[in-house]
Amino acid sequence: MGLAHSDLFGCSGCHTPHNAETLPGVPLWNGSETTLTFTMYSSASFQGTIDGQPSGDSRLCLSCHDGANPDFAWMDPQHSFGSDELANSHPISFVYDSALATLDGALKDPSQASTLGATIAEDLLDPESKVQCSSCHDVHTSGVGQSQLRGYDYGPQHGPELCRMCHIK
């Protein structure tokens, strides 16, 4: 396992070695949950049901990436991360299951293999079968400026490999 943002924060950016549960169920978390209310993703073509607010580990990500943390003021304002505006991002905090894949028609069944070694469900979804920030972003990989995208080739031939793990086209 690599170090998330090792160039900037190391492990202590997210973890604290001597405060085992600052948030219930989140061992070694070095922070508090965000208190902002977020504008969630919305689209007429989206077939899933998104939680009213971010859930799961996305809430942990947003404790820093919510636009209120001065340590992240350097983030590109053209991107919607680092703010309470999630309406233009990839949706998070929704169940991705076989029923959604069938209904949508452009999503792979989560029981299919991913390019990471197991199934989409095992590699990318949280324990509640939900898509979260960590579905696409591997927080334990170094490489600031690359958004820590899972299985993404940052070489000259890069393309939408990550997107195609779930999306048919």
Regions found by a protein language model. Give the residues of each.
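C-type cytochrome heme-c attachment and multiheme electron-transfer modules
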Residues: 1-12, 16-169
